[in-house]
UniProtKB/Swiss-Prot annotation:
PANTHER family: GLYCINE CLEAVAGE SYSTEM H PROTEIN, GLYCINE CLEAVAGE SYSTEM H PROTEIN-RELATED. This is Glycine cleavage system H protein. The glycine cleavage system is composed of four proteins: P, T, L and H. The modification N6-lipoyllysine is found at K63. The lineage of its organism: Bacteria, Bacillati, Bacillota, Bacilli, Bacillales. The glycine cleavage system catalyzes the degradation of glycine. The H protein shuttles the methylamine group of glycine from the P protein to the T protein. It holds the Pfam family GCV_H. Binds 1 lipoyl cofactor covalently. GO terms for cellular component: cytosol; glycine cleavage complex. Belongs to the GcvH family. The keyword Mitochondrion does not apply. GO terms for biological process: glycine decarboxylation via glycine cleavage system. The keyword Ion transport does not apply. Keywords: Lipoyl.
Length: 125
């Protein structure tokens, strides 16, 4: 299982990456593996304000449909529109081309509450 050390994680299997004043968000390799082949992604709208812990979309696979939760509070400034036609990018590259959304105006307390890769990995055992 791939687990980049430079990302932060949630117990719900989302990852967060600081990116020059904004934060890129996706689901972990573990999560995509558990879901199986992803066939559809419901994305939030650009301009939406999302609240940590709230469902902000869904990911549909051949096995199930799973809600996607906001790991931090912030404003959606971009979504990965490529996922509309190629949702399988989450399976093939969850930490790069399979990113889901980008937030700004993120509450710093939410970021500091996220898990390091080591702490996230311990929770998988």
């Amino acid at each position: 299982m791939s687990l980049p050390k430079d990302l932060l994680y949630t117990e719900e299997h989302e990852w967060v990456k600081a990116d020059d004043g904004s934060y890129i968000i996706g689901i972990t390799d573990f999560a995509q593996d558990q879901l199986g082949d992803i066939v559809f992604v419901e994305l939030p709208e650009v301009g939406d304000t999302v609240t940590k812990g709230d469902s902000i979309g869904s990911i549909e696979s051949v096995k199930t449909v799973s809600d996607f939760y906001a790991p931090v509070t912030g404003k959606v400034v971009a979504v990965n529109e490529t996922l509309e036609d190629e949702p399988e990018l989450i399976n093939s590259n969850p930490y790069d081309t399979g990113w889901i959304l980008k937030l700004t105006e993120v509450e710093e307390a939410d970021v500091t509450a996220l898990l390091s890769s080591d702490d996230y990995e311990k929770g998988l055992d």
